[in-house]
Amino acid sequence: MIGEASQAGAQVVALPEAALTGYGPDMVARVSSREVTQAEDEVKEACRKCKIAAIIGTPSKGYNSALVINSDGSEVVRQHKMQLVPTDLPWSRPGDTLHTFSLGGVTCSVIICHDKRYPELVRLPVLAGSRVVFYISAESYHDDLPLPAPRDGVRWDEARLSRELGVYRAQAQARAVENRVWLVKSNWAGDAVQPTRGSHGQSCIVDPTGCVVEEAGIYDEALICHTLDLDQASALYAHKSLQPEYALSGWWREALARVRRVGDE
């Protein structure tokens, strides 16, 4: 996928949550820390050879992390998942710091799966300068099963599945438009043969007005690409949180102390 993205002209490629090992305690447990480190090094080398930056999910020293790699193969930062779900708990603990970082001269940030349900985890990095939010995930329903999976032996009909998928799409759109920034989502594809595996796909790119400009299918592992017009990413609505006349502006300014700006040290 890294080579394919580079050949397509992309400057950055985003891969899903726990993409290095597969998501879930059983999959993570099958891989040693040495093997994880070796796999990370191979991804870094692929980025260097292909001259492309990457964001990839990895189990990282007790965290569920997004590893950010520059186009020269160097490690930029590891953003740890902040809000965990039951399937995270056997192998990871929550992160305690948000980050912004630069890729190709653009300030970015990243959230991981369940983090999307907490708008402050997007807005705070945007207030710190992020204009492209990457969102990597292995999304599941509230019962921790993939949306296409059968429940009590019965699969949802197309109408019900479509309604539920719409909720997940809407959350990505909301995080983009409520901050007026780009959002790039990379989610595990669904498995049509074994629907209890994987997720429900629909990786997408959302513009700062909340419109989905590119979207993958439910069951297809696909590369989607788009040229981001960064002039559209004004962060207009996010910055209104800091206006002196806004009653909660002091809270937002205080919370900004939890954002680490990588490269500004």
PLM region descriptions:
Residues A5-S32, S137:
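Short, conserved active-site loops that position catalytic residues or coordinate cofactors/metal ions
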